[in-house]
C-alpha cells in the first residue's frame, strides 16, 4: 500500500485476511435491448480485493475520528475499480482511453458498444443497471447476494 496507512490502521492480520473477496458484476440493459429480448451486457467485473482500505480500516478510521457510527448505519465502499479496462468501476472510467491515472478533463473517450448498435458514454433514460455480488473461494461455498437493479427514469417536468 502506498502510502502506508497509519499504524493504528495497519496489522499483519488485516493485511493477510482483512479484506473481503467480494466479486461485483455490473450489467446494462437498454430499452432497445429489452424490446429485442437480448441479454444484458456485462460492463465490468471487479473485486473488493482491489480496494485500498478494508472495511475494518474504514470503520476504525471513522469511529476513531469522532464519527458517531451506530448500529444500522450504512457504510459504503465507493467505486470498486481494478487495474484492467474490464474491471473499471464506473462508466466514466470504462469509456476513458489511455491511462486513468493521468486522464485530464476533456480526455478522449470511447463509447461502450452495445449489441443493438447503440453506444453509451453515460446512462440514458430507460437504461436498466443490474448489480450482482458474490463471494467464493476454492475451499468455501459460493455465497450470492442476489441482484440489485434500477431503471433510469426521465427527469420530472416542472409544472
Regions found by a protein language model. Give the residues of each.
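Catalytic-pocket segment enriched in acidic/His residues
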Residues: 1-159
Amino acid at each position: 500500500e502506498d502510502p502506508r496507512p497509519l499504524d493504528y490502521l495497519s496489522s499483519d492480520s488485516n493485511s493477510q485476511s482483512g479484506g473481503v473477496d467480494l466479486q461485483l458484476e455490473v450489467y446494462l440493459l437498454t430499452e432497445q435491448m429489452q424490446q429485442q429480448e437480448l441479454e444484458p451486457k456485462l460492463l465490468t467485473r471487479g473485486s473488493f480485493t482491489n480496494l485500498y482500505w478494508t472495511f475494518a480500516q474504514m470503520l476504525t478510521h471513522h469511529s476513531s475520528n469522532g464519527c458517531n457510527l451506530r448500529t444500522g448505519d450504512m457504510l459504503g465502499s465507493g467505486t470498486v475499480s481494478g487495474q484492467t479496462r474490464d474491471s473499471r468501476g464506473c462508466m466514466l472510467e470504462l469509456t476513458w482511453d489511455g491511462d486513468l491515472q493521468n486522464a485530464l478533463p476533456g480526455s478522449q473517450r470511447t463509447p461502450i458498444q452495445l449489441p443493438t448498435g447503440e453506444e453509451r458514454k453515460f446512462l440514458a433514460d430507460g437504461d436498466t443497471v443490474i448489480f450482482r455480488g458474490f463471494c467464493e473461494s476454492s475451499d468455501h461455498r459460493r455465497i450470492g447476494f442476489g441482484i440489485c437493479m434500477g431503471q433510469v427514469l426521465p427527469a420530472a417536468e416542472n409544472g
